[in-house]
């Protein structure tokens, strides 16, 4: 094998030596391509696996933790929620519409492959500076393309996109982040797993035909970008949501039968990863007859068939004798279905082309025992330079308030979420635009499931460990503010180039923060994804661990809103304000800096707040609640009253006026009627949570907070109309 071919497959000299040892000979091109894909960062997690191993993954309500297509938790009365968040960053930067659309398609397949009907989607989007003279126009093009791709796929599938977050920073100028989350619901006893066992059981290919799109996608997503990256468009997959809708319905029909052993979607590395993962998990072997693959293009080779990432395809291990019944279901839905192999006990993948053996590879070294790297780490030099920076107010508080509310990181994103169908399936209780976590009704048991997606990249830049812990806490707090109990998380860890020791240090610290927070807050990790090599021309993104928290409220009718719907409601701040300005939005806007330090998270205070919110809502004491986040109580209150029909007369009583922009954790704003005040304050005392009265909601169309005064019309204009102007 010549060195150029090996290098083109991103195989190092050390890895090639391992290949020779595993095979006992030189690989052919097909085998090299397969091994390259399975050992890519995207498929093998070779740089990250050692740090993920310590994640808390168990709890009495966890049915399935990491290692399957998605995580599963018990949501009561025999029902389960199946969910996962995943990235499609690199493809979305290269081809925003197709990249984002297939990102949605992939995460939907991960969930319905487990036997669940998908009932909700969320997304976390990070773009570069839309005001930048050089790249601002391109960033706006990326925003529009990505949003169009997500809405096209989700809307066509009939899956409501009910929430998300969108942030902008120059660190994403060369690498945008597109993280998609899906949640499905099924009976706890009806979950299907990705396994291939039982010697002689048939392996069946179902779904769309295979083309040349997405070739080398997994390897491409395991590398950084440079000027030549524009030529990678052919590696971006092309999605067809209508085919996926047929595939989902066919699979859900199949799941009502007893015909199959296991099922796996064909995602990154296509037929390669699905076959190796199924056999690897089961300790089996497999024969695949590649010439039987349904092909969309003529003249396709075994190499192309194994590595194509054409969308809307699944691999099924059926019970022997049920092949025709399985195929009949998929044919009914106008999909391809063909027996293309069988399970063996050899522990090897045997690849045939017109009955000739063209590839023979041991499965375990490519799946369960793929190489794990121990990359060097070192603390980034910038941390010592930024940690002592102190934020001081330099402009008028009213000016700063207005600047912040109309900033693209805070203002309303109706331009984005209005393109998503959030009400299809008629289960949505709280969707995007209503602040905080999104909520859906589970008709089968009367409960509701709340979900929130969270990632503050600036905080993770300032302190990767505490920043990651804060993401776990913040997502959970948003769920708690709906009245639900946070139960578990899914994570998507977006970082820079792992070959840079400073990036690996950030990643290791981020994992430590997630481990610590999940353990202390009793929200185990049940699924997730790692996206590395988010770097362009040597510049890495800020560390960006995206966390989705999922929780359950037993009675959907008790779901809390985040808006004040009545006048004369008492407005309270819960929790302590500690003067946290490190990595804050107010510092970024006023000083154009991301600096400072972060205080350790007080987990007892965080849990006490969650427990108080749950109990107070169960006792029907609260009218509304919202987590305090970016921009402190100033922005939290401004947004709550912008989406409300009433005005506000509020006083913070802080000694230092800038404290209204403090971003301390473990805080919430609540609204309650005056007759419930005493009972609530007694309960807060019982839980050890400080409650500070800020004022009341009023019938006057006016917003007042300390010295800040705006008419309701001015407040609404700043919040609701700014982004539409900025993105044009």
Curated annotation (Swiss-Prot):
Substrate binds at residues 87-90, 109, 237, 309-311, 531. It is an enzyme of class 6 (ligase). ATP binds at residues 45, 84, 491, 528. It catalyses: N(2)-formyl-N(1)-(5-phospho-beta-D-ribosyl)glycinamide + L-glutamine + ATP + H2O = 2-formamido-N(1)-(5-O-phospho-beta-D-ribosyl)acetamidine + L-glutamate + ADP + phosphate + H(+). Pathway: Purine metabolism; IMP biosynthesis via de novo pathway; 5-amino-1-(5-phospho-D-ribosyl)imidazole from N(2)-formyl-N(1)-(5-phospho-D-ribosyl)glycinamide: step 1/2. It is found in: Cytoplasm. The active site is at residues 42, 88. It comes from the Bacteria. One of its GO terms (cellular component) is cytoplasm. Mg(2+) 2 binds at residues 110, 265. One of its GO terms (molecular function) is phosphoribosylformylglycinamidine synthase activity. GO terms for biological process: 'de novo' IMP biosynthetic process. Keywords: ATP-binding, Cytoplasm, Ligase, Magnesium, Metal-binding, Nucleotide-binding, Purine biosynthesis. Mg(2+) 1 binds at residues 86, 529. Monomer. Part of the FGAM synthase complex composed of 1 PurL, 1 PurQ and 2 PurS subunits. Belongs to the FGAMS family. Part of the phosphoribosylformylglycinamidine synthase complex involved in the purines biosynthetic pathway. Catalyzes the ATP-dependent conversion of formylglycinamide ribonucleotide (FGAR) and glutamine to yield formylglycinamidine ribonucleotide (FGAM) and glutamate. The FGAM synthase complex is composed of three subunits. PurQ produces an ammonia molecule by converting glutamine to glutamate. PurL transfers the ammonia molecule to FGAR to form FGAM in an ATP-dependent manner. This is Phosphoribosylformylglycinamidine synthase subunit PurL. The gene is purL.
């Amino acid at each position: 094998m010549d060195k150029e071919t090996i290098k083109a497959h991103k195989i190092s000299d050390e890895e090639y030596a391992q290949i020779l040892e595993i095979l006992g000979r030189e690989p052919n091109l097909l085998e090299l391509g397969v091994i390259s894909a399975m050992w890519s960062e995207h498929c093998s997690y070779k740089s990250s696996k050692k740090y993920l191993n310590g994640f808390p993954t168990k709890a009495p309500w966890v049915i399935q933790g990491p290692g399957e297509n998605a995580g599963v938790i018990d949501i009561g009365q025999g029902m389960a929620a199946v969910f996962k968040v995943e990235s499609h960053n690199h493809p979305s930067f290269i081809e925003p519409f197709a990249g984002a659309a297939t990102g949605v398609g992939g995460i939907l397949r991960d969930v319905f492959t487990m036997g669940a009907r998908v009932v909700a989607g969320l997304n976390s989007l990070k773009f570069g500076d839309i005001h930048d003279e050089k790249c601002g126009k391109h960033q706006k093009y990326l925003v529009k393309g990505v949003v169009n791709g997500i809405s096209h796929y989700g809307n066509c599938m009939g899956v409501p996109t009910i929430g998300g977050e969108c942030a902008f920073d120059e660190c994403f100028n060369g690498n945008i982040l597109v993280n998609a989350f899906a949640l499905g619901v099924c009976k706890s006893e009806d979950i299907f797993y990705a396994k291939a066992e039982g010697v002689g059981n048939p392996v069946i290919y179902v779904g769309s035909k295979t083309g040349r799109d997405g070739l080398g996608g997994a390897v491409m997503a395991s590398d950084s970008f440079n000027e030549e990256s524009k030529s990678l468009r052919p590696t971006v997959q092309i999605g067809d949501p209508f085919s996926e809708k047929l595939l989902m319905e066919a699979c859900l029909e199949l799941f009502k039968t007893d015909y199959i052993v296991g099922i796996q979607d064909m995602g990154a590395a296509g037929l390669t990863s699905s076959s190796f993962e199924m056999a690897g998990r089961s300790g089996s072997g497999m024969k695949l007859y590649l010439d039987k693959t349904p092909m969309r293009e003529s003249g396709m080779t075994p190499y192309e068939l194994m590595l194509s990432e054409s969308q809307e395809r699944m691999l099924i291990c059926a019970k022997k004798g049920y092949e025709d019944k399985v195929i009949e279901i998929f044919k009914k839905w106008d999909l391809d279905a063909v027996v293309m192999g069988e399970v063996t006990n050899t522990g090897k993948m045997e690849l045939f082309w017109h009955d000739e053996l063209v590839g023979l590879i041991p499965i375990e070294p490519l799946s369960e025992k793929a190489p794990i790297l121990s990359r060097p780490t070192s603390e980034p030099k910038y941390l010592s330079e930024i940690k002592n920076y102190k934020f001081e107010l330099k402009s008028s508080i009213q000016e700063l308030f207005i600047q912040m509310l109309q900033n693209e990181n805070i203002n309303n994103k109706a331009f984005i979420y209005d393109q998503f169908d959030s009400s299809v399936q008629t289960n949505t209780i709280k969707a995007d635009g209503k602040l905080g976590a999104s909520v859906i009704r589970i008709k089968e048991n009367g409960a509701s499931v709340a979900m929130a997606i969270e990632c503050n990249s600036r905080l993770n830049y300032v302190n990767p460990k505490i920043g990651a812990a804060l993401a776990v806490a913040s997502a959970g707090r948003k769920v708690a503010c709906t009245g639900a109990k946070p139960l578990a998380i899914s994570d998507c860890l977006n970082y820079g180039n792992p070959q840079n020791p400073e990036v690996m240090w950030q990643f290791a610290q981020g994992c430590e923060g997630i481990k610590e927070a999940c353990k202390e807050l009793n929200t185990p990790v049940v699924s997730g994804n790692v996206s590395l090599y988010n770097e362009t021309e040597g510049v890495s993104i800020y560390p960006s661990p995206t966390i989705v928290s999922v929780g359950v409220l037993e009675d959907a009718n008790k779901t809390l809103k985040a808006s004040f719907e009545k006048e004369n409601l008492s407005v309270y701040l819960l929790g302590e304000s500690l003067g946290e300005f490190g990595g804050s939005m107010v510092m970024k806007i006023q000083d154009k800096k991301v600096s400072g330090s972060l205080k350790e998270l007080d987990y007892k205070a965080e849990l006490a707040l969650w427990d108080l919110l749950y109990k107070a809502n169960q006792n029907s004491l609260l009218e509304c609640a919202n987590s305090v986040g970016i921009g402190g109580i100033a922005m939290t209150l401004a947004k709550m009253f912008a989406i409300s029909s009433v005005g506000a007369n509020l006083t913070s009583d802080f000694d230092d006026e800038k404290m209204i922009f403090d971003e301390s954790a473990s805080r919430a704003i609540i609204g309650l009627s005056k007759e419930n005040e005493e009972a609530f304050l007694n309960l807060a005392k019982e839980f050890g949570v400080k409650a500070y009265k800020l004022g009341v909601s009023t019938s006057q169309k006016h917003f007042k907070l300390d010295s800040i005064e705006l008419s309701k019309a001015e407040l609404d204009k700043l919040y609701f109309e700014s982004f539409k102007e900025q993105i044009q």
